Amino acid sequence: LCKMSKTDKISVNGKSYNWPTKPTVVICLDGSEPGPKGYIDTAIRMGFMPFMKSMVNKSTYEIGKCAMPSFTNVNNMSIVTGTTPDIHGICGNFFFNPEEGKETLMNDDSFLRVSTIFEVFENAGAKIAVITAKEKLRKLLGKNLKEAICFSSEKADVVNLKDNRIENVLDLVNKPLPEVYSSDLSEFIFAAAVEIIKKEKMDLIYLSTTDYIQHKSAPGGKLANDFYYMLDGYLSKFYELGCEISLTADHGMKGKTNEDGSLNL
């Protein structure tokens, strides 16, 4: 396939996208609740995200709406297809299968009804990398990809050219396989992306983390501050490598009810 011109637009599921003019890093930061009391604003205010602070006033910085229900898979697939759950088909973590009479996890890519932005851009000649924390999400995001680098930090020790289009990731990153329930699982994603961008000319890089830290720590807590300080360092590295950066979240961490038991909508 011939790579399309940078002036061309690509149509995916009824929406038009510009061809990247520089390596474009899109980060879905799992559970990173926005707003004045959210994780990033709090980390900036407390001095743990100096790079992010420097970018806020000269970049687009807005609060957007997430897809409902506000689950990880639902929102990741909404981001990467540009559609809503009723169109892309991933409408929850599981559903009740009336034919089998039991709950069925929606991790299989057969439930995805439309093409991802990755698939369409790859077919147009784009060089793409998709790196996730968890393997189950990697399988959904990587549907129909044939050339793109696509792996999870959870399974970084078993990546291979046939399935992931990359090998020896632990050596590339110079880090051990991270524990699943740790901040390291997300940091490995960023570290791997930096090395891949240094090594290859990429067009689109999608990184999706885990919300382990957000479940463990409220905004401003030590674990959260350490995590966002780490993230800030990698954002700075992506910027130094000439990347366009887009940072969003799949959902927040607010409770479903208020202290009096009323719904917190």
Each model region followed by its residue ranges:
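Active-site-proximal N-terminal segment of extracellular/periplasmic enzymes that hydrolyze or transfer
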Residues: 2-59
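Anion (oxyanion) recognition and catalysis
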Residues: 56, 122, 239-240
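Catalytic metal-binding/acid-base residues of hydrolase active sites
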Residues: 32-33, 210, 217, 251-253
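Short acidic, glycine/proline-rich loop/turn micro-motifs
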Residues: 38, 216-221, 258
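Metal-dependent active-site segment of extracytoplasmic phospho-/sulfohydrolases and closely related
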Residues: 26, 51, 226-264
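His/Asp/Glu-rich, glycine-adjacent segments
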Residues: 2-3, 82-218
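Structural motif
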Residues: 26-28, 204-208, 246
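Short, structured active-site-proximal loop/turn typified by the sulfatase FGly-forming signature C/S-X-P-X-R
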Residues: 35-82, 127-129
